Regions:
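Condensing-enzyme catalytic core mediating Claisen C-C bond formation in acyl metabolism
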Residues: 3-7, 24-38, 43-50, 216-285, ...
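Active-site pocket-shaping loop/turn-to-helix segments
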Residues: 64-85, 135-143, 161-173, 218-234, ...
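Active-site-proximal alpha-helical scaffold in enzymes
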Residues: 87-92, 144-148, 152-155, 160-194, ...
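Active-site-proximal gating segment of KS-fold condensing enzymes and close homologs
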Residues: 108-162
Length: 290
């Protein structure tokens, strides 16, 4: 594939806001997990588990001009966009290439479903007359594309706008999609990334699958008993590579083994193929035999 540069990047998670906060926490071996203090609660008590919750979202309302997109997920998107100079990097790309040549490709698993949960919990009326409360009667929020639509309006990008929703792979696939848009000549720069926030559907859905650990998760440990859920938002700006670029997208691979609705192939064939295809692409770009 033609060289694609990563011109800017940022991340916000339970570890903190911005790349520096993530690095500091990793170097200090500090976890972002804490005892679950996020609703909705069953019988007055939260689900007994550990979560990675981003502090400050409850007080980080969107600017008034974006009120129709107001929800926890878009709040985190706005917070992440306003970190590490990401919003300015997108603005610079628009100034250089034009708004129609800057695309948005973002991934999300549940998007703004937390707002939909609240709307159903607060229905006005009964039976066939039940309606969402006025403050949540905003159709643009109750769709998986809420994130992509919000970011396009928030940044002013007017190129292709795509929201990828393929569960846990969503925010990885956007790099491949963004690179293809540039390769096809449909965009000169692409804002890629992903945002997912805590909500009842995620917490209780994974718990129903018996996948949520009651203790802090222990990835790769023989004693592991499940996962811990959290929320985070991260973005990168892709563009055609130029001399002197430090960071480039070396390659990507995608597959779908279609083994099971919620479980991978026992031998991980889908993941194997994706990684093999990505490595083969890197070798081709380096002029080596795949």
């Amino acid at each position: 594939m033609p060289p694609v540069a990563v011109a800017a990047y940022t991340a916000t998670s339970a570890l903190g806001r911005g790349v520096a906060a993530q690095l500091e926490a990793l170097q200090a071996q500090r976890s972002g997990l804490r005892a679950n203090d996020f609703g909705p609660h069953v019988d007055g008590a939260p689900l007994p588990c550990f979560i990675g919750r981003v502090d400050g979202l409850e007080d980080a309302a969107l600017p008034a001009e974006f009120a129709q997109w107001e929800c926890r997920n878009n709040r985190l998107a706005w917070m992440a966009l306003d970190t590490d100079g990401m919003a300015q990097a997108v603005a610079d790309a628009i100034a250089l290439h034009g708004a129609e040549r800057v695309a948005v490709v973002v991934g999300t698993s549940t998007s703004s479903i937390g707002a939909s949960e609240e709307a159903y919990a607060r229905l006005d009326g009964d039976g066939d007359e039940a309606r969402f409360p006025d403050d949540l009667a905003r159709p643009i929020v109750h769709t998986v594309h809420s994130l992509g639509d919000f970011l396009a309006h928030a940044t002013g990008a007017r190129g292709p706008c795509i929201t990828v929703a393929t569960a846990c792979s969503s925010s990885a696939k956007v790099f491949a999609q963004g690179a293809r848009l540039i390769e096809a000549g449909l965009a000169d720069a692409v804002l890629v990334g992903g945002v997912d926030t805590l909500c009842g559907s995620v917490l209780y859905g994974f718990n129903a699958l018996q996948l949520v650990s009651r203790e802090r998760c222990m990835p790769f440990d023989v004693r592991r008993v499940g996962l811990s859920l959290g929320e985070a938002g991260g973005f990168a700006l892709l563009r055609r590579a130029q001399p002197g670029d430090v960071l480039q997208l070396a390659g990507y691979g995608e597959s779908s083994d279609a083994h099971h609705m919620s479980a991978p192939h026992p031998q991980g064939l889908g993941a194997q193929r994706s990684m093999a295809d990505a490595l083969a692409e890197v070798k081709r770009d380096l002029g080596q035999d795949a």
